Amino acid sequence: MKHTPLTFLLLILASSFAFCQEPTPKGHPLTLTGYGFYDTHYASGSLGGGALMLDWQAAPAFCLGIGAEYASSNRISARLTGQATILTTLLQQRLTLENSYLWRHFPALNLQEFTGALQIGWYARHLNLHLGLCNRYIAELVQRNNGGQGTVFEPMNVMFAIEGWWHNSLVPNQWNIGLRWSNYNDFIIERVANWFFSAKALYSLPDSTRLYAEAGIHPVGSLNLTASYDGWFLHLGAVKPL
């Protein structure tokens, strides 16, 4: 616990960088992403909700993003992300450095979760790789018998994501399909042994809007307490350059 402030300070100093899934088209510095989702598993039933994210391409190699999610009285989430492209090859492959901060609130449990993460990413023609570390606080726990409140700190959890795409993901395609294996998504970071497996699909409209869908399985339970794969989720949304 005594090293916690220093750890988060290092994350902040190492950041000022943001993360965008794909470069924003020229002339469109802002990109709005919205999706609805349905999530169900045996342990906690079903829930629905939606999310909005806004990305700002502040410079050719720098992007800043904000986002919020609401999940039918189960959780409310917000995040701030930042990414810099630190290397671009002749084939347009990119090496990025990403910093993100995630806040989640669970009203029924009176819990709040704060997570800071730092990642590197590699974007190639058909494969995207991400690897990083995060620190997590879980605060405002249920009062103990002595009337006090506690805080749980989880240092240095590993984050990873591997995505494979049918078409070259570095250039525009009318459609694309892919597979993803990771322990996190936009507003959830699981422990490294709790994995998400999903299939993704993208379709581009003439006005540069992209429709997308993602369906997969994921660990069940709340706050990373179990890892049995009997749950599934569905995301449906669109990405619109502004």
Language-model features: where?
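Cleavable N-terminal export/targeting peptides
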Residues: 1-29, 242
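Predominantly the C-terminal beta-signal and adjacent terminal strand-loop region
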Residues: 191-242
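Outer-membrane beta-barrel architecture
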Residues: 53, 81-87, 117-121, 161-165, ...
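Detector for outer-membrane/organellar transmembrane beta-barrel domains
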Residues: 115-186
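Transmembrane beta-strands of outer-membrane beta-barrel pores
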Residues: 34-42, 68-74, 86-88, 101-107, ...
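Short glycine/proline- and aromatic-enriched beta-strand/turn motifs that initiate or cap beta-hairpins
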Residues: 20-73, 239-241
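Repeated loop/turn-to-beta-strand initiation elements of outer-membrane beta-barrel proteins
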Residues: 30-32, 60-66, 89-97, 125-131, ...
